Amino acid sequence: TSTFAQIEHGLIVGAGVGFPLQARWNRPPWGDESNWSYRHDYKLNSMIGYRFRFLPEQKFFYDLDITMGFQKMETTKYFPYYESIEDGIYVSKKADVFDEFVMPISVAASWNWRFTKKFHLGVGIAPTLYVQPQAVFDLSVMAKVGYRLSKHCEFGLSYQYGCFNTLKHFNNGPANGRRGHLSDLMLSVYVPFVLK
């Protein structure tokens, strides 16, 4: 029987937390106003997509997930040095807080090992195109664990780490000078429609 004759597929939805990782760099001297620092926090991290599973009944099987993410990232932009001294008190610039809508479109391919009847582990890669706030490509590495609750429901927990310096492309608008990687931890539910 060919691989393509042994395909299971269905809807996948997920929600989780994101970890934008701000890269460090050498700070310029005190008083250089080009030196802004950033703190990032995901307020919303969700996705929806479709999964194709090849060789679903075998000990080793493969998943191909096509997903679209919906993320809201809150960024705090602040100046790490004191600006002045007033009445013996050091005064810093007021921090700016702004929100950005981040939309990644991803095609994730993973190799999976079923080590019990219900549980499996997987590793893979996820080429990702961010279409918001700016168009930029990233390549994530992925690790995941899954639990098959029933014939028509599976839970999964996955972690993805973006290999490229994606944040440097999000510097239009109120941000400038930031750089770093994007990663997230996602809990998902897979609902197969077609079982082979």
Positions of PLM-derived features:
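Residues that define the transmembrane beta-barrel architecture of outer-membrane proteins
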Residues: 7, 40-48, 60, 99-105, ...
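Membrane-embedded beta-strand positions of outer-membrane beta-barrel proteins
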Residues: 9-15, 62-66, 107, 121-125, ...
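Outer-membrane beta-barrel "beta-signal"
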Residues: 12, 16, 147-148, 179-196
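Transmembrane beta-strands of outer-membrane beta-barrel pores
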Residues: 15-21, 52, 68-74, 113, ...
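Surface-exposed strand-loop-strand hairpins of Gram-negative outer-membrane beta-barrel proteins
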Residues: 18-47, 168
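Extracellular loop and loop/strand-boundary signature of outer-membrane beta-barrel proteins
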Residues: 31-38, 91-97, 129-132, 171-177
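Transmembrane beta-barrel domains of outer membrane proteins
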Residues: 49-55, 110-112, 144-148, 188-192
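Repeated loop/turn-to-beta-strand initiation elements of outer-membrane beta-barrel proteins
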Residues: 58-62, 117-121, 151-157, 163, ...
